[in-house]
């Protein structure tokens, strides 16, 4: 009975560990940056300075679409065109303060406020 129990425990333990590893790998750390921490963090991370605190630079390729919002998705088919566009460009209205102080943000979101390398 002891050997059977160990085998059964292993059959449960291995898939559980694999699932845990996959879940941890997909988690991206978020942070809240308020007060002096926000401009200090931007200054340290952004080599060429950072953009205005009210909006980020527009990315002409994807027009700041929300990550994971695919064209012709079920949500898009259910909503009207204006609702879809509002969802896609929601972040255009929010500034770094809205994203990183009122809510928490990821490092990738902070870096999107960095100014581009100046053209020479």
Swiss-Prot record:
Annotated GO MF terms: hormone activity; insulin receptor binding
Compartments, record wording: Secreted
Signal peptide stretch: 1-29
Tissue: Expressed at a high level in seven cells of each larval brain hemisphere that may correspond to neurosecretory cells.
Propeptide intervals in chain numbering: 51-89
GO cellular component: extracellular region; extracellular space
A Pfam entry, by short name: Insulin
Transmembrane segments: none
Highest taxon listed in the record's lineage: Eukaryota
Matching SUPFAM superfamilies: Insulin-like (SSF56994)
Alphabetically ordered keywords of this record: Cleavage on pair of basic residues, Disulfide bond, Secreted, Signal
Bridged cysteine pairs (disulfide): 34-101, 46-114, 100-105
GO biological process: female mating behavior; insulin receptor signaling pathway; locomotor rhythm; negative regulation of entry into reproductive diapause; response to carbohydrate; sleep
Subunit structure: Heterodimer of a B chain and an A chain linked by two disulfide bonds.
Function statement: Possible ligand of InR/insulin-like receptor.
Protein family (similarity comment): Belongs to the insulin family.
Name the record gives this protein: Insulin-like peptide 3
Source organism phylogeny: Eukaryota, Metazoa, Ecdysozoa, Arthropoda, Hexapoda
Gene responsible for this protein: Ilp3
